[in-house]
């Protein structure tokens, strides 16, 4: 990726802060379509990428531009507790459990809320097939009880969205070559697609007339090819068969 492309892509703002989960995750719930769930969405690859460093990260955001500018100008990457936890771990980081009530982090979160960033938030670490890393965040201004329920109901959709967005960002930015992606066999692809549609291993083996162990082997083989650790990550890998 050339420096000019990295520079163009490093500060891309998505449109509209009034987001609904139905818009991003295909919710079929009428209440979900009528009531805003999220305040902002943010995607960032702050490190371990050619052309994207801590000082020039790959970002797609709906945060207020004034907050984004202040975040970058004051190098908040270095004190943001969510970024620090997300870099080290694999599990979602709930903002309320990220130690934001201590020291500089408290002032950081209070300042973020003053700029209109949601008071609730969860950040999902993403690990790509070529070792790249990114963080995907959604925020909300709903009360604690509502936010907890939304988070439980929507976590799977948010994980799928996080990995899909990461995959597209890597390809469209030129940081990952499509030709470099692994090719899946027909059976591997079938097992992945059925799993993505919610079928269990027993149901897949009945449809394909193969054993449960064979289904598990095909999924494990696909995970190795895509170099991912979980089936959720696997389902967002390249859909190409031999």
From Swiss-Prot:
InterPro entries associated with the record: Sig_transdc_resp-reg_C-effctor, TF_LuxR_autoind-bd_dom, TF_LuxR_autoind-bd_dom_sf, Tscrpt_reg_LuxR_C, WH-like_DNA-bd_sf
One matching Pfam family: Autoind_bind
SUPFAM superfamilies given in the database record: C-terminal effector domain of the bipartite response regulators, Pheromone-binding domain of LuxR-like quorum-sensing transcription factors
GO terms under biological process: quorum sensing; regulation of DNA-templated transcription
Residue ranges of every copy of the HTH luxR-type domain listed in the record: 177-242
Keywords: Activator, DNA-binding, Quorum sensing, Transcription, Transcription regulation
DNA-binding region ranges: 201-220
GO MF: DNA binding
Sequence similarity: Belongs to the autoinducer-regulated transcriptional regulatory protein family.
PANTHER family associated with the record: DNA-BINDING TRANSCRIPTIONAL ACTIVATOR DEVR_DOSR (PTHR44688:SF16)
Protein name: Transcriptional activator protein RaiR
């Amino acid at each position: 990726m050339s420096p000019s492309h990295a520079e163009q892509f490093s500060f891309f703002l998505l449109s509209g802060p009034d987001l609904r989960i139905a818009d991003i995750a295909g919710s079929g719930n009428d209440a979900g379509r009528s009531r805003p769930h999220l305040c902002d969405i943010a995607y960032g690859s702050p490190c371990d990428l050619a052309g994207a460093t801590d000082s020039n990260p790959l970002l797609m955001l709906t945060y207020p531009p004034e907050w984004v500018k202040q975040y970058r100008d004051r190098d908040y990457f270095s004190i943001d507790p969510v970024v620090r936890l997300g870099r080290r771990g694999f599990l979602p980081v709930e903002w309320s459990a990220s130690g934001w009530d201590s020291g500089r982090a408290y002032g950081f979160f209070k300042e973020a809320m003053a700029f209109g960033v949601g008071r609730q938030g969860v950040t999902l670490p993403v690990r790509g097939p070529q070792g790249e890393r990114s963080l995907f965040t959604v925020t909300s201004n709903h009360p604690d009880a509502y936010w907890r329920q939304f988070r439980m109901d929507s976590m799977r959709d948010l994980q799928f969205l996080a990995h899909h967005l990461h995959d597209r960002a890597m390809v469209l930015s030129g940081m990952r070559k499509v030709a470099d992606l692994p090719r899946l066999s027909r059976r591997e692809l079938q097992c992945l697609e059925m799993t993505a549609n919610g079928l269990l291993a027993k149901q897949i083996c009945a449809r394909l007339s193969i054993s449960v162990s064979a289904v598990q082997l095909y999924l494990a083989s696909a995970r190795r090819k895509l170099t991912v650790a979980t089936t959720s990550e696997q389902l967002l890998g390249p859909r190409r068969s031999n």
